[in-house]
Every structure is written in C-alpha cells, then in structure tokens.
C-alpha cells in the first residue's frame, strides 16, 4: 500500500465521485476472478464460453457453466470492500458506481446509483422476443432454459465482441469525463471499453486512485496505487472506523449524510464469505 493517501481530503472536497470495479472486489467473497492465479480464464477458454459464437454452437455447454457460477455466487455475500463502496455512495453528493461485475453483490451491499457495464448474471434475455427478465432459479431446472414464448434464453451479460448496453456506457463515460475523484478497485484494466474510463477521468482532471493486489496498466497513470486486498485496504483508505478486533464498523453515521438523501439504509456487518 502507498505510504500516504490524499484520498480522504480529495473526497471531502469532491462533488462527483466515480468508482470502477472488477472481479477483484468480489474475490474475498469467494467469487473467482477471470485473470491471474485461480482465474476462470486459466481453466476455461473465453472463446468456448463467453462469445455469441460459443453460445450459438453449444448453448447447453455455456448454460452449464453459467449455472455452476450462479450456484456458487448465490452462496456469496458482499465483503468489506463492497460495504465500503456502499457507504461511499451515501457520502458523496453525486456518485456513480461503474461495475464490470455481473454477480449482483454491489446491489446487495446497498449501492443504488450503479451501472452494470457487462450485464447481470441474474437476468436472462430471450433470443426470440428480446424480453429481459430476472431469473433467480438455482440450480436451473432446465438447461438451456426457455422463454414462455418458446425462445432460447441467454444470460443477460456482455460477451467478447458484443456491444455494451449503450445507456450504461454513456452514463459511465459522461461521469468519467466530469468527476472529481475516480476510484478503481479490483480490475486488471485490460478489457475495453471499461479500461479506458480511468484514463478519460485522469485527462479531464480527476484524482485517480487504484486498489489492486498487483500493478496494472493503470498504475503508472494513477495518482495513488495501493497494493493488497480490497476488503482490507479500501475501508482503511476511506477512514471507516474499526472496533478493537479490527472489524470495520459499516454504519451510515460514520459518514456525513447528504441532507436530501432518501435512499434505503446500508446493510450492517458483512456476513461470512462463501468458499470458492
Ligand atoms: C484483487 C483481489 C483482491 C484479485 N483485492 N484486487 C480495443 C483494443 C483491444 C481489444 C478491444 C478493444 N475494444 C474492444 C476490444 C475487444 C474486447 C477486449 O477488450 N479484449 C481485451 C481482453 C483485449 N472487448 C470486447 O469485446 C467488449 N465489447 C466491445 O468492445 O464491443 C465493441 C462493439 C461495439 C459495437 C458493436 C459490437 C461490438 C466486450 C467485453 C465483454 C467482457 N465480458 C466479460 C464476461 C462477462 C460475463 C461473465 O461474467 O461471464 O466480462 S470477460 C471478463 O473480463 C468479465 C469482466 O467483467 C471483464 C474484466 O475483468 P476484471 O473484472 O478486470 O477481472 P480480472 O480477472 O481481469 O482482474 C481482476 C483483478 O483483481 C486483477 O487485477 C487482480 O490482481 C485483482 N484482485 N483479488 C484487490 N482481493
């Protein structure tokens, strides 16, 4: 971790705060990352599972993979990094969480102002009638699942070679161009177009802070880069108090609330993460 940090001072002065997250933020909840040791792409080929061509070739195989990931993620809980980001949303006058994660854990932690650039594992999308619906069935009773209209359903996620949801990408780009602080947590910063957002923010004058286990292509460009586990580093960086045993106290009262805030309360102490 960098010896000193100006993040708290910058946040105190900031009007618009953006956070970009990747798989590393959920790693300590027990959700596997994609790249690096233990990453999904070490075990599976993205071309076989995460492209539209792979799905058309073998929807059953792709759905079996997604079903097994949904089963694992269904047992996972947000960790201290998710909770810290949820508290940050309550503190910032204007805030946007831009996540590449499809696991839904940020929402579970209490974030409301968020865009999911790569979709969500708990939604399905009918290839025939185009309807997008929530689907929480774990495990799936039929693989591949079908829509009421008889059409083939696919996970409502973004695969390689596919366009990101245009409204989500536009909102993320607009916020990156105009924010005062841009925090980047647990992403390898290699998958485009998400990987360009911190650079856009930096060029437009934002204070850019990265938290990651290891250096990334962003490290040399960021104002601060902190290396270690997000669930340990992020609450400390944000000044969230901890008790005598070192457990962070995730209470809204630990932050000054914007006066007009009417959002739901942030959930309390994190639950135990599941085993991967
Ligand atoms: C911790 C930690 C702890 C671990 N604490 N840290 C320009 C140049 C080159 C290529 C392209 C380009 N533009 C587009 C492309 C192609 C491609 C791309 O970027 N490829 C690169 C890999 C080279 N991009 C696309 O295809 C995108 N589409 C697109 O651009 O379309 C254009 C278009 C326009 C109009 C019409 C048609 C097309 C789509 C990208 C979709 C990505 N999809 C996936 C799968 C989602 C569904 C699913 O989950 O199954 O999204 S791939 C995967 O990577 C997933 C992630 O969201 C994404 C990013 O990964 P992330 O989150 O960064 O995870 P990791 O594993 O890479 O990194 C984890 C990090 O955490 C590491 O750094 C660890 O060190 C760290 N860490 N534990 C802190 N405890």
Protein language model regions, located:
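Conserved catalytic core of sirtuin-type NAD+-dependent deacylases
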Residues: 1-248, 272-276
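Short, basic, low-complexity termini and linkers enriched in Ser/Thr/Gly/Pro
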Residues: 240, 245-269
């Amino acid at each position: 971790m960098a010896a000193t940090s100006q993040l708290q001072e910058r946040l105190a002065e900031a009007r618009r705060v953006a956070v970009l997250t990747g798989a590393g933020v959920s790693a300590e909840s027990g959700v596997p990352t994609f790249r690096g040791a233990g990453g999904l792409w070490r075990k599976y080929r993205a071309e076989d599972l995460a492209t539209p061509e792979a799905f058309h070739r073998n929807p059953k195989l792709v759905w079996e993979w997604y079903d097994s990931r949904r089963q694992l993620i269904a047992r996972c809980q947000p960790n201290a990094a998710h909770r810290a980001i949820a508290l940050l949303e309550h503190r910032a006058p204007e805030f946007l969480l831009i996540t590449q994660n499809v696991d839904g854990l940020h929402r579970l932690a209490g974030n409301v102002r968020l865009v999911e650039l790569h979709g969500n594992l708990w939604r399905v999308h009918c290839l025939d009638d185009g309807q997008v619906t929530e689907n929480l069935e774990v495990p799936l009773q039929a693989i591949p699942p079908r829509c009421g209209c008889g059409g083939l359903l696919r996970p409502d996620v973004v695969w390689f070679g596919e366009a990101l949801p245009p409204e989500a990408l536009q909102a993320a780009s607009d916020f990156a161009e105009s924010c005062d602080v841009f925090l980047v947590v647990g992403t390898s910063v290699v998958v485009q177009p998400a990987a360009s957002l911190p650079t856009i923010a930096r060029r437009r004058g934002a204070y850019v802070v990265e938290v990651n286990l290891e250096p990334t292509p962003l490290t040399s460009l960021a104002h601060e880069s902190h290396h270690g586990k997000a669930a340990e580093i992020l609450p400390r960086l944000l000044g969230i108090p901890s008790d005598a045993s070192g457990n962070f106290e995730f209470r809204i009262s630990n932050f000054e609330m914007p006066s007009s805030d009417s959002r739901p309360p942030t959930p309390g102490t994190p639950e135990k993460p599941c085993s991967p």
